[in-house]
Regions:
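Acidic/histidine-rich, surface-exposed loop or edge segments in extracytoplasmic proteins
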Residues: 65-78, 148-150, 187, 234, ...
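Extracytoplasmic/secreted proteins, especially bacterial periplasmic and envelope-associated proteins
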Residues: 64-71, 87, 91-98, 103, ...
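Active-site-adjacent substrate-binding region
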Residues: 84, 105, 109-111, 223, ...
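Intrinsic disorder/low-complexity segments
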Residues: 1-39, 43-45
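Acidic/histidine-rich catalytic neighborhood of metal-dependent amide-processing enzymes
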Residues: 150-254, 258-259, 267-270, 275
Length: 329
């Protein structure tokens, strides 16, 4: 970018029911306790399953997401076309399959300022129920790191944080199959430009993905969320000016509901990122990003700059937005 009781035999159930009936009749015969009072007492004693049901945004673990980031950082620099990025791909695929997702590799070759490079997007859909409707919402991140000749760039925040978050979202959402089948996960390769962002340099994966969608007909997707650089210890999510207004309102409302609104604001300048090619083909996609990050594209973009709390904040708000707004209908 740039500026997740055993069944009781019927007979035993009947016996318990008969004994309960006897006890109630006995109470009514030998006590002055009104039936209404007894019914109220029994009703109050029955626990409510709804009251104790865990909300999906409460299931997200910033600590688990951070472990994914750590694994990617441990691989070292993994720019597009490198041996290390193949290891990153294998790790992402393994984690997604463990959470119940089927992964497809979308491989292609493109011209770059460094010559032809092979890129691979990873596209995941939830397993099972092949007759279900096609996914209608995109969740995206890039997983490559920028290529530098002079520094060792591991991209803990830029590439790592959003990938770790998306893997944790996959775990949490995968526990709710009906919701998971509405979502397509996309891990873009080649987000980073080799020289300067332009129509032909940078956003290689998202540009190719959008082009294929447009050729096939992109009408099935009614929206998407892109995550990028969301792990900064001093978190300040800044939505770009080109954010689809309705989606921005939903993100702000989700943050407000979780009492996290102070972490979300608007960016005061335009931003080029992987959401742009999707918006260009009329898939309203919002970029959740903290672009004011002092270590962007430096050797100091390392794991110590990332916090589980920041990942927790972003993941919780995203899940609230998905469950209460984006996928509500």
């Amino acid at each position: 970018m740039i500026s997740n009781a055993s069944l009781t035999p019927w007979g035993s159930q009947r016996q318990r029911s008969d004994r309960s009936h006897f006890r109630v009749n006995s109470l009514l015969r030998y006590s002055n306790t009104p039936l209404l009072g007894l019914v109220v007492t029994l009703t109050i004693c029955v626990p409510s399953s709804r009251a104790t049901e865990t909300k999906i945004w409460e299931e997200f673990s910033g600590e688990k997401a951070l472990l994914h980031v750590q694994h990617l950082v441990d691989l070292g620099p993994h720019p597009a076309g490198s041996d290390a990025i193949e290891k990153a791909r294998e790790y992402i695929e393994a984690q997604l399959r463990h959470s119940g997702w089927q992964v497809t590799r979308q491989a292609f070759t493109d011209e770059t300022p460094r010559g032809k490079v092979r890129f691979v997007n990873l596209i995941a859909r939830f397993s099972g129920n092949e007759n279900a409707a096609a996914p209608s919402f995109l969740l995206c991140s890039h997983y490559d790191t920028k290529l530098f000749d002079a520094i060792r760039f591991v991209g803990a925040n830029d590439g790592g944080s959003s990938t770790g978050l998306l893997l944790e979202l996959a775990r949490v959402i995968g526990r709710r199959p009906n919701m998971a089948r509405k979502i397509e996960l996309v891990f873009f390769d080649g987000e980073e430009a080799y020289e300067n962002f332009s129509e032909t340099d940078g956003l290689y994966g998202s540009r190719y993905f959008a082009k294929q969608l447009e050729a096939e007909g992109a009408k099935q997707f009614r929206g998407g969320i892109l995550f990028d650089m969301i792990g900064d210890r001093s978190l300040d999510i800044t939505l770009p000016p080109d954010s689809p207004p309705a989606m921005a309102r939903d993100i702000f409302a989700a943050a407000e509901a979780l009492k996290l609104r102070n972490y979300f604001s608007y960016l005061d300048r335009d931003l080029i990122d992987d959401h742009a090619p999707l918006n260009a083909i009329r898939i309203p996609t919002i970029d959740i990003i903290d672009f004011d990050y002092a270590w962007w594209h430096t050797a100091d973009d390392t794991l110590d700059k990332i916090s589980a709390q920041s990942l927790q904040i972003t993941g919780s708000v995203a899940l609230y937005c998905l469950s209460e707004f984006a996928l509500k209908h």
